[in-house]
Swiss-Prot record:
Pfam families: Tautomerase
Disulfide bonds: none
Organism the protein comes from: Streptococcus agalactiae serotype V (strain ATCC BAA-611 / 2603 V/R)
Classification via Gene3D superfamilies: Macrophage Migration Inhibitory Factor
Name this protein carries in UniProt: Probable tautomerase SAG1079
Length: 60
């Protein structure tokens, strides 16, 4: 049962996230030979000011 977690800065529309989830599901199903009904995609909208690579605030 594949679980796919995607972290994105917030700002994408619901339509964009829906399309992303559908496309990711298709690819995972094809490559991992997993039934689509067993694939779970989680999209996390990260607010600006919450990402610190190498300890430094990263902005969009």
């Amino acid at each position: 049962m594949p679980f796919v977690k995607i972290d994105l800065f917030e700002g994408r529309s619901q339509e964009q996230k829906n399309e992303l989830a559908r496309e990711v599901t298709e690819v995972v199903s094809r490559i991992a030979k997993a039934p689509k009904e067993n694939i779970h995609v989680f999209i996390n909208d990260m607010p600006e000011g919450t990402y610190y690579p190498q300890g430094e605030l990263k902005k969009k």
